[in-house]
Curated annotation (Swiss-Prot):
Cofactor: Mg(2+)
EC number: 6.2.1.1
Lineage of origin: Bacteria, Bacillati, Actinomycetota, Actinomycetes, Mycobacteriales
Family annotation (InterPro entries): Ac_CoA_lig, ACAS_N, AMP-bd_C, AMP-bd_C_sf, AMP-binding_CS, AMP-dep_synth/lig_dom, ANL_N_sf
Protein's gene: acsA
Protein name: Acetyl-coenzyme A synthetase
């Protein structure tokens, strides 16, 4: 097994040149520690306020926060107008790449201002006013960003629904938000083919009695045929295209609602996470500048997330634009028309900062380094990871192969609910450890606690890993302001577990090492109890993926009469690895060696693919059903439900 455990570095300090020119310096930690509220006031004052705030934080009605009290601003003005007024109107705001090869658009900040103003005027003409809700059900096209900013400009809450979601998911979100307008497209491109989108929108609306939606604004994207409801349905290019490009933004209170974003509603009613204007944009702008070290004059930033997810909101729209950065948006899948697509885009636009998910990184690993190696990726100077804990093997591969062994890599931890990144290395300061999100950002306070809310001591060398609960013990500017229409659920979901301490419970397990670095281990639900030992699925998965033949792994705990739970692993092998009769036993032995004999999987199944949601998350719940020979639960959010035929055949 020696080939699976080569001598590798345990930490990676930033290159001297990067550290010398980094936006964030070590003094930030000291400033935030000395006076946290003054620190956040300083960050907020980087925005343009029509009316200055008079109080930084009002926590008198905890857990409902008010940040930058009394201040007024317009989010869209901060993302667009002020850059044009500062003389940067000719700077590219968005390089958009459609999935069909050759389909592209470029919008400067002046172009974006005109388009957002036209859309704002069009929405006003349709009778929308501040406080209304608009549902956006679009592929990742420029109109999606324009629609979001037009809503923000008018004080209207947008509720973006991922274009891969079903009619039922869209219906639930429209009903909960009582949306007055739905913005959609005739269709979208997926894996080289046009597929209908408005048809799902029509199905969703038809299933709603006394539907709140008055109009459906339709973007022509694919040209496919569709049903049309006269009087209700309107073409974007008619309504927005004919509107005036002149519009004066109105300031809104710092706590004015900005958007709703729903977390998965596959079981029960979806949770509408509500974010507001001043606090969200402050932390969004701050984290973009410090974590990603953006230089507006020279950087080209690419966050690969769809705008249907919070990562796409914060680091695909508001973060880059409020900092005046040039960004790339790509509509399609990473393997259309072939597996070179992402690397062609990096090369084409000279992307300097690339932010993606571990799922995609592991997919690239599975495809082999020959693909990225055939492209010039030298423009990249910083890499980022988001969405789930990244295992050390994938971390190193990402840095070595995509980053050429020279770029800093920021592994960011945050949630839909936190609004912005919370735990991450600062790239010009930290000696990053593969697999660790490192430390809370300046201005953020986090703890790892036990069942009683007491802080856990750092892990010591040779001792058993102790998994605790990741909690946030101080309010932060971009925190959610509640669950739409359900304050009791907000308290119960996030604050009830440690109510006596006043901690926000993130739902993730984590541990802290002797250097104070935080290792997020995934959802607490993904912690197994084997003979009284709590073992994280993430730790076992990391041990499996560290083997030279494994591309991806998913681990679940299954019922066992002797040990309470046993570990069952599903692994996808690398394309260039030749399996043999003892592959499964070899992997079981490796896990026992890396973690503990207690962590040795009872079963290892080699499968062709893992079941994933449309957002790329592995559905361990369904793998548990397979492992325990149960009927599959809800598969509505799966990207490809047929994957279970192959998994069962392999098992």
């Amino acid at each position: 097994m020696s080939e699976s455990t080569p001598e590798v570095s345990s930490s990676y300090p930033p290159p001297a040149h990067f550290a010398e020119h980094a936006n964030a310096r070590a003094e930030l930690y000291r400033e935030a520690e000395e006076d946290r509220l003054a620190f956040w006031a300083k960050q907020a004052n980087r925005l343009s306020w029509t009316t200055p705030f008079t109080e930084v934080l009002d926590w008198s009605e905890a857990p409902f926060a008010k940040w930058f009290v009394g201040g007024e601003l317009n989010v869209a003005y901060n993302c667009v107008d002020r850059h044009v007024e500062a003389g940067h109107g000719d700077r590219v705001a968005i390089h958009w790449e459609g999935e069909p090869v050759g389909d592209r658009r470029t919008l400067t900040y002046s172009d974006l201002l005109a388009e957002v103003s036209k859309a704002a005027n069009a929405l006003t003409d349709l009778g929308l006013v501040a406080g209304d809700r608009v549902a956006i059900y679009l592929p990742l096209i420029p109109e999606a960003v324009i629609a979001m900013l037009a809503c923000a400009r008018l004080g209207i809450m947008h509720s973006v629904v991922f274009g891969g979601f079903t009619a039922a998911a869209l219906q639930a979100r429209i009903v909960d938000a009582q949306a007055k307008l739905l913005i959609t497209a005739d269709g979208q491109f997926r894996r080289g083919k046009p597929s209908p989108l408005k048809a799902a929108a029509d199905e969703a609306l038809a299933a709603i009695p006394d539907c709140s939606v008055e109009h459906v604004l339709v973007v022509r994207r694919t040209g496919i045929e569709m049903a049309w409801s006269e009087g209700r349905d309107l073409w974007w290019h008619h309504v927005v295209g004919s509107a005036s490009p002149a519009h004066t933004p109105e300031p809104f209170d710092s706590e004015h609602p900005l958007f709703l974003l729903y977390t998965s509603g596959t079981t029960g009613k979806p949770k509408g996470i509500m974010h507001t204007s001043g606090g969200y944009l402050t932390q969004c702008c701050y984290t973009m500048r410090t974590i990603f070290d953006v230089k507006p004059d020279s950087d080209v930033f690419w966050c690969t997330a769809d705008i249907g997810w919070v990562t796409g909101h914060t680091y695909g729209v508001y973060g880059p634009l409020c900092n005046g950065v040039t960004e790339v948006l790509y509509e399609g899948t990473p393997d259309t028309p072939d597996r070179h697509r992402h690397f062609q885009i990096i090369e084409k636009y000279g992307v300097t900062i690339y932010y993606t998910a571990p799922t995609l990184i592991r997919m690239f690993m599975k495809w082999g380094r020959e693909i990225p190696d055939s492209h010039d990726l030298s423009s990249l100077r910083l890499l980022g990871s988001v969405g789930e804990p990244i295992n050390p093997e994938a971390w190193r591969w990402y840095r070595d192969v995509i980053g050429g062994g020279r770029t800093p890599l920021v592994d960011t931890w945050w949630q839909t609910e936190t609004g912005s990144a919370m735990i991450s290395p600062l790239p010009g300061i930290a000696a990053a450890k593969p697999g660790s999100a490192m430390t809370p950002l300046p201005g953020i306070s986090a703890k790892i606690v036990d069942d009683h809310g007491d802080p856990l001591p750092p892990h010591t060398e040779g001792a058993q890993h102790v998994t605790g609960y990741l909690v946030l013990d101080q309010p932060w500017p971009s925190m959610l302001r509640g669950i739409w229409g359900d304050p009791a659920r907000y308290w119960h979901s996030y604050w009830s577990k440690f109510s006596d301490k006043g901690y926000y419970f993130a739902g993730d397990g984590a541990r802290i090492d002797p250097d104070g670095a935080i290792w997020v281990l995934g959802r607490i639900d993904d912690v197994m109890n084997v003979s009284g030992h709590r073992i994280s699925t993430a730790e076992v998965e990391s041990a499996l993926v560290a083997h030279s033949g494994v591309a991806e792994a998913a681990v679940v705990g299954v019922t066992d009469e002797t040990t309470t739970q046993a570990i069952c692993a599903f692994v996808v092998l690398r394309a260039n690895y030749a399996p043999h009769d003892r592959t499964a036993e070899e992997l079981r032995t490796e896990v026992a060696r890396v973690i503990s004999p207690i962590a040795r999987p009872r079963d290892v199944h080699v499968v062709p693919e893992l079941p994933k949601t449309r957002s790329g998350k592995i559905m361990r719940r369904l793998l548990r059903d397979v492992a325990e020979n149960r009927e599959l639960g809800d598969t509505s959010t799966l990207l490809d439900p047929t994957v279970f035929d192959a998994i069962r055949a392999a098992k």
